[in-house]
């Protein structure tokens, strides 16, 4: 493997700002902000807007849109009665 062409891989703390959930993982991304982890070491912190702890798909709070067709949506939007009524 060639030297000095690969990004540096190190441990970082990913912090979900929505739920304050933290997890330690390896990454090539870095930050000037650091935080102490449970093992007593300081690691760079990467702030996330969403993670598996706050994403609706993983938390079970996902909403499914109604499966209306295009004609039904058009009729509803412009106040027409559907043919089924």
Curated annotation (Swiss-Prot):
Highest taxon listed in the record's lineage: Bacteria
Record keywords, A-Z: Ribonucleoprotein, Ribosomal protein
Gene Ontology molecular function, alphabetical: structural constituent of ribosome
SUPFAM superfamilies referenced in this protein's UniProt entry, alphabetically: L28p-like
Record-level GO cellular component terms: ribonucleoprotein complex; ribosome
Keyword Ribonucleoprotein: yes
A Pfam family reported for this protein in Swiss-Prot or TrEMBL: Ribosomal_L31
Any one of the GO BP annotations: translation
Cysteine-cysteine disulfides: none
InterPro entries: Ribosomal_bL28/bL31-like_sf, Ribosomal_bL31, Ribosomal_bL31_B, Ribosomal_bL31_sf
Database matches in Gene3D superfamilies: Ribosomal protein L31 (4.10.830.30)
Record has Transport as a keyword: no
Record-stated family: Belongs to the bacterial ribosomal protein bL31 family. Type B subfamily.
Complex formation: Part of the 50S ribosomal subunit.
PANTHER family hit by this protein: 50S RIBOSOMAL PROTEIN L31, CHLOROPLASTIC, LARGE RIBOSOMAL SUBUNIT PROTEIN BL31C
UniProt protein name: Large ribosomal subunit protein bL31B
């Amino acid at each position: 493997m060639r030297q000095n062409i690969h990004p540096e891989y190190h441990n970082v703390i990913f912090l979900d700002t929505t739920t304050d959930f933290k997890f330690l993982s390896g990454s090539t991304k870095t930050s000037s902000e650091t935080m102490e982890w449970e093992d007593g070491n300081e690691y760079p912190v990467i702030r996330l807007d969403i993670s598996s702890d706050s994403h609706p798909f993983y938390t079970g709070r996902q909403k499914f849109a109604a499966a209306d067709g295009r004609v039904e949506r058009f009729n509803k939007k412009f106040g027409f009665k559907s043919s089924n009524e």
